[in-house]
Design a protein with these regions (language model features):
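Acidic, polar-rich low-complexity tracts and alpha-helical solenoid repeat scaffolds
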Residues: 1-242
Length: 242
């Protein structure tokens, strides 16, 4: 007769096994169970019963579980804590990328507040600055461009609103900011057109004509470029010189 299974004592799982179990639950989509399993690793670490590597791995995986559940605030907290403690960890670049994406995936439509877009931009900049050799750096650069595009679009949207509300000076301030800070974005043609209209409104015809000429020449392939040319011709000032 063999030993009574109920009396058998198995050794406790190793730190690596505990983390692997949480990782497996995460991979199968059982995020709540993964968080529960991995949280035990963190607790054991606080009790001095778990190595720091296991703690770091569990910390990231908990953040990843929250990320996949779109629980952005909790994911951000985990990722920020990881980066603050382990900025040179072998997966620190991935954690930084996930942190940036936690903001990026929350970006609002153009007409709404773009604070989250700015935060995403800041975190992607940190990614490419601190981890330039990362496999995620290329996508980080692409996301930087998209964030800048969205912020520039919002500035133009606000400028257009100010102009339609009879506040050309506020509109000018926004439009000139776009030309200065976001010169490589796709909103430049629209910005030039609107700034020309602001100048016409304020009686600065020569400045308006110069902007429309630039628009019709440099961006003739765009709809705004074609509209700029039409506006220039209809103004009767096409031959005006400054």
């Amino acid at each position: 007769k063999g030993p009574d299974p109920s009396r058998l004592r198995f050794p406790p799982p190793t730190p690596a096994q505990r983390v692997a179990a949480g990782d497996m639950l995460l991979r199968t989509g059982d995020h709540d169970a993964a968080i529960n399993q991995l949280s035990k690793v963190l607790e054991l670490f606080r009790q001095g019963q778990m190595p720091e590597q296991a703690y770091a791995d569990a910390s990231f995986l908990i953040g990843e579980a929250y990320f996949r559940e779109s629980e952005w605030d909790k994911a951000i907290k985990e990722f920020e804590t990881f980066i603050s403690f382990y900025p040179r960890h072998q997966i620190a670049d991935l954690v930084q990328y996930r942190l940036a994406m936690s903001y990026y995936d929350q970006m609002k439509p153009v007409e709404q507040d773009q604070a989250l877009t700015q935060r995403a931009l800041d975190q992607f900049k940190r990614l490419v600055k601190d981890y330039p050799q990362s496999r995620y750096a290329t996508d980080g650069l692409a996301k930087i461009d998209k964030c800048r595009e969205r912020i520039a679009q919002k500035e133009v949207w606000v400028a257009n609103y100010y102009f339609t509300q009879g506040n050309p000076s506020a509109a000018r301030q926004r439009l000139e900011l776009v030309l200065k800070e976001y010169p490589r974005t796709g909103v430049i043609p629209e910005t030039l057109f609107l700034l020309a209209e602001v100048n016409f409104y304020e009686g600065k015809n020569a400045e308006a004509v110069e902007l429309l000429r630039r628009l019709s020449v440099d961006y003739d392939f765009t709809e705004w470029g074609r509209r700029g040319k039409q506006r220039l011709n209809s103004s009767g000032l096409a031959g005006t010189k400054r």
